[in-house]
Structure formats: C-alpha cells, structure tokens
Design a protein with these regions (language model features):
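Elongated, amphipathic alpha-helical interaction scaffolds
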Residues: 2-300
C-alpha cells in the first residue's frame, strides 16, 4: 500500500506551491510505486540490517507537497511489524544540507504516523515511533568517498551544543568499488545505475535526447530494466532528460557562485590592505567564518 499524505505546511513553506507540478523521477518510478513493490522490497533489504520478508509488510510513504522545489527523487518505506522507517534519496550531487532536508521529511512523516496510529504524545505513556534510517545514494561524476556521514550539527550556528542533538544522512557513492556489495544485493539498483552511466557516457558525444534514447534501446536489448523501460519508456525519457538538464543547470549555478565568490574575496583583500588590515587579508584565505564576517562588515 502506498500512503500519500495531504499537504501540510510549515510556517515558512508558502513558497513551495510549485511542488504540485513536480513529477516523479526515474528512481521514484522504479522504487516508489505499488506496481514495482518487489523493487522497493529489494532496495529496502539491501540497505537495512533487519530484512523485510514480504512486500506486503512494506508500506511506501510519499509526501505530496512537503519540502521540495524540484523533481521528487526519494522514496520512504515503513515496515510496520519491525517499526522501521527508511528514507532513500538518489542524488547526482552531494548536498551538505541533506541532513536538514531529511529531518524535515521525517518530522512530517512522524507527524502523520502519530495521527494515523492515534498516538497521544501529550500523555504519560512513552510513544514508540519507527526507527529512522536516512540514506542518500550518490551517483554523480565527482569523486567522493565510498561512504560519508553528513551531520546536521555542522549547520548549527553554535557548534558548542552539537552533542545535544544530532541527525545524520549516510551517503553511499554507488560509483565506488567498495560499494559493489550494495549493487550486488539489489539487482534493480545495479541496472538503474547502469542505465544512468550509459546516458552520462553518451551525452558527452551527442544531444541529451539522443543519448537517453540510445541508452533506453540498448538496455532493453540487453535485458537491463527491460520490462520497466518498455512499459515506462515515455516517462523515463522525459524524466531522464529533465534530470540531466537539471545537473547542467546546477553546475552552471555553482560555477557562477564560485566566480562571484572569488571576485568578492579579491575586493575584500583590496579593502583590507587599504585599511591597513593586512593580517586579516592573509587569514581570510583559510578562515571561512572570518571571511563571511568581513563580507558583512564591508557589505560585499
């Protein structure tokens, strides 16, 4: 069963109305629908230390309009008998804000779970909630460690209180040889990465639409996601083209940001030398917090 929760906004979510037009990614089509429930079970078991024995025990959770402004690229699984809640995201970039994103997602999901199960969080009895697991599957082109732990405490303005609260996202680099075990445990995930690898390879030498079409044709011929691609060819084609175009757009924004940051840093160094603060001009090269503070001071 797939549970779709109604829209539930936080105070600062008024700008997220575009989410209603958000389309599912190839990843969600493959692992987040009732029609592909066995795929969901395989992925859940590959990532979980406590396996789920049957697809019927697995509930797929989706939030219709939570915290996203792009394409939905994640799926959530609840195994009710074991009270475990797993959120899995597929990403082509490593975003340091993923722990915050995951925290908001889980807060929404827990809120709806408590309502559905008619739990009383204001009573004297301890309310038990599903044990969370938050996983990010990275398959981008940038080199990255096999496994990374991203912590929400890195975002705290006051780092001295980080031990008081923590929320973690575990990032697996699917392109790293040390994570071949994960692909071996979930054949569909392995085939999904193979499809994406082909699209990436072909788009370097041909337009993205032709690259996607060629990857789809080859994978069908070679038995890679064959039945899925035959059935969902149009959706996958549109989704893949959009996703890879989004990657190009995101890279261009990051490049613009780097160039702007370099220009601002040079301006700041010139101003510091003008004001006789040469010692700070040397420090801002490595001290990010000092650089931010001085940007504000000089209104850059």
């Amino acid at each position: 069963m797939t549970k779709k929760y109604p829209k539930k906004r936080f105070i600062n979510q008024v700008n997220y109305t575009t989410n209603r037009r958000r389309k599912d990614s190839t990843f969600c089509l493959l692992f987040g629908s009732e029609a592909c429930k066995e795929n969901a079970l395989s992925l859940y078991n590959a990532l979980s230390s406590v396996p789920c024995k049957a697809a019927e025990e697995l509930t797929i959770y989706t939030l219709e309009d939570a915290v996203y402004i792009k394409r939905k690229n994640d799926v959530g699984y609840l195994v009710k008998n074991d009270l475990r809640l797993q959120l899995v995201e597929a990403q082509s970039t490593i975003n340091p804000n993923m722990p915050l994103h995951g925290l908001i997602y889980f807060a929404e999901t827990y809120s709806n779970y408590i309502i559905t199960e008619e739990q009383n969080i204001y009573g004297s009895t301890l309310v038990k909630i599903p044990t969370p697991q938050y996983v990010v599957l990275y398959e981008g082109e940038r080199d990255a460690d096999a496994v990374q732990k991203l912590r929400i405490s890195d975002s705290f303005e006051d780092r001295s209180v980080r031990e008081e609260f923590e929320w973690t996202a575990t990032v697996y680099n699917l392109c790293h040889k040390e994570n071949r075990w994960l692909l071996d445990r979930c054949r569909i995930l392995k085939e999904y990465t193979e499809f994406n690898e082909r699209v990436r390879k072909y788009k370097k030498v041909m337009p993205i639409k032709k690259a996607v079409d060629l990857a789809v044709e080859e994978c069908i011929e070679e038995g890679i996601l064959a039945e899925f691609l035959k059935k969902h060819r149009a959706e996958v084609r549109m989704s893949a083209i959009t996703e890879f175009n989004q990657e190009v757009y995101d890279r261009s924004l990051r490049q613009e940001g780097r160039e702007e940051g370099i220009e601002k840093s040079f301006k700041l160094m010139a101003l510091l030398h003008r004001d006789g603060r040469q010692d700070l001009a040397d420090k801002i090269i490595t001290d990010i917090e000092l650089r931010k503070k001085l940007f504000e001071e000089y209104q850059l």
